[in-house]
Amino acid sequence: TCLIAFALLGIGSTILQVSLNPLLTNVVKGNVLASSLTAGQVLKAVSSFCGPFIAAFAATVLGNWQYLFPIFALLTLISMGWLMLVHIREESPEQSTSSWGATFGLLKDRTILLLFLGIVFVVGVDVGINTVAPKLLIERCGFDVTGAGVGSSVYFAFRTIGAFVGTFLLARVSGSKYFRVNILVAIAAMIVLFFMSGQYSILVLIALIGFTCSSIFSLIFSMAIQARPEKANEISGLMVTGIFGGAVIPPLMGYCTDLIGTQAGSLIVILCCMCYLLYCSVGIKTRK
């Protein structure tokens, strides 16, 4: 029963990710789209942050942590009702339903293919940094496993702050320039991270990487939709499948770490992903 419930939660979460982004394109356009997608990432991060507190409230006040499930169900029903009451005029350029083949056929478009790989690598960077941060503190600073978790916490916190700041900046500045500047700073921080062994210097660099990479997922997503706006639904579904990068990059990191013998192997893999993202920021042009 629990496995079925978790499967349904995963399916529902994926459906939301696929459907909400093209729905948003009917409300906002251009650079504001990237800003709005980033705002969605902020809300998602804040919601994730609140989850443990809701569980604690259910356990201490209501007497059982399992009461968080009815609370989540109620919040979901409220959100669904709210969305149903909001009138959104949806564009319907095509009446036919796209097949799997037609959706993945979009990868024949060079721009869509490059941006799809961008999603794969940016998710890989996100999961990779979250994974390697505690290991760096253990390897270079002598932290124990429990204390090393501060690395992931710092990354997550500054990723949320960066997405919040990006929400406002992307409504005022060019998305391509914002993308370019942030990924350049992230690459610089990553290169410096190879040589740092102090606790605070490592945490500062991890924070900087989290801050600068926070809006890149949304920027790539909006670039893909702007490249083929008439295929927004198909592109949204296609891009969401790119999150499998979070399952592909960490094993590569592990292999390189074993090969080299230090976490520098993991950093090399992440740096290569960032270099590809730099190419996306300067080599891919989409319509405004």
Segments predicted by a language model, with ranges:
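C-terminal transmembrane helical hairpin of 12-TM major facilitator-type secondary transporters
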Residues: S176-I220
